[in-house]
C-alpha cells in the first residue's frame, strides 16, 4: 500500500471484561466471558460480545485451544447505521516455559470473522488472520502480584483483500493481582498500530479484566 494514499488516524479505546473459568481437570478447562469496548477516546460504545473458549494441555506446558465470539458491533458511519451482528471463531497453540519467577509464553492463533446475514457478494469478505504472540511474565513471590509484557504481530490471509500480509502489531503491558476466594483482577495498557494498509490507524488501549475460576477436580 503506498503511503501517499494512507490515512493516519489515532484513538484511545477502553476495554473491559468479566470471565468465569471452569477447570474440569488439570488438563481441560472452559471459560465464558462478557466484553465491552469503547472508542473515540472512550466516549462511544464500539462493540460488546460474548466469548466461549476451551483449552486442553496435550503435554506439559503445551496447550491446544479454541473459541467462538458472538459480537454486536456499533456501526455509526455511512448511510446505514446501527448494531451489526458478527461471528468469530479461533484456534490456537500455546506454549509456556517457566524460569523460577519468570515465564516465557508463546501463542499462534488463527481467527476468522464475518458479519452474519450477508453474502460475500455484498462485500462481506471474512477477516482472516494468523496472529503470532510472545511475552514475558514475572510473579512477585507470595503476593499474588504479577506483570506481563506481550508483543503480537498480525498476518492477514484472506486472498480477496488487497491488504494481505503482515499489517498490524500490538504491544501490551499488564499488571494483575490474584485474591484468595475472590479471583483475579488485571489492568493493562496496549498500543496497536497498522502498517502496509490504506488506513494507518493507531490506538492506545486502556483495559480492566476480572476472572474467577472454579476447580472441579
Model-based region annotation:
Residues 1-12, 214-216:
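Bacterial Sec-dependent N-terminal signal peptides
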Residues 18-22, 52-56, 91-95, 110, ...:
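Residues on the lipid-exposed face of transmembrane beta-strands in outer-membrane beta-barrel proteins
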Residues 174-217:
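Long hydrophobic alpha-helical segments typical of transmembrane helices together
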Residues 34-40, 68-74, 97-99, 110-114, ...:
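Transmembrane beta-strands of outer-membrane beta-barrel pores
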Residues 103, 107-184, 190-192:
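Outer-membrane beta-barrel transmembrane domain signature
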Residues 12-14, 46-48, 85-89, 124-130, ...:
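Residues that define the transmembrane beta-barrel architecture of outer-membrane proteins
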Residues 7-67, 71-74:
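Start-of-domain marker
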Amino acid at each position: 500500500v503506498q503511503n501517499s494514499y494512507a490515512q493516519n488516524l489515532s484513538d484511545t479505546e477502553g476495554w473491559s471484561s468479566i470471565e468465569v473459568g471452569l477447570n474440569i481437570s488439570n488438563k481441560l478447562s472452559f471459560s465464558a466471558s462478557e466484553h465491552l469496548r469503547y472508542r473515540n477516546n472512550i466516549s462511544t460504545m464500539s462493540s460488546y460480545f460474548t466469548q466461549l473458549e476451551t483449552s486442553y494441555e496435550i503435554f506439559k506446558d503445551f496447550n491446544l485451544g479454541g473459541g467462538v465470539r458472538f459480537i454486536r458491533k456499533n456501526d455509526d458511519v455511512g448511510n446505514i447505521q446501527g448494531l451489526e451482528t458478527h461471528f468469530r471463531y479461533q484456534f490456537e497453540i500455546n506454549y509456556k516455559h517457566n524460569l523460577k519467577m519468570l515465564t516465557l509464553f508463546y501463542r499462534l492463533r488463527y481467527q476468522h470473522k464475518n458479519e452474519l446475514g450477508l453474502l460475500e457478494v455484498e462485500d462481506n469478505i471474512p477477516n482472516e488472520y494468523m496472529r503470532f504472540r510472545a511475552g514475558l511474565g514475572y510473579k512477585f513471590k507470595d503476593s499474588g502480584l504479577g506483570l506481563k509484557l506481550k508483543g503480537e504481530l498480525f498476518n492477514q490471509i484472506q486472498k480477496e483483500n488487497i491488504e494481505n500480509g503482515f499489517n498490524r502489531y500490538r504491544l501490551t503491558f499488564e499488571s494483575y493481582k490474584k485474591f484468595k476466594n475472590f479471583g483475579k483482577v488485571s489492568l493493562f495498557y496496549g498500543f496497536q498500530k497498522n502498517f502496509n494498509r490504506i488506513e494507518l490507524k493507531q490506538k492506545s488501549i486502556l483495559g480492566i479484566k476480572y476472572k474467577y475460576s472454579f476447580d472441579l477436580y
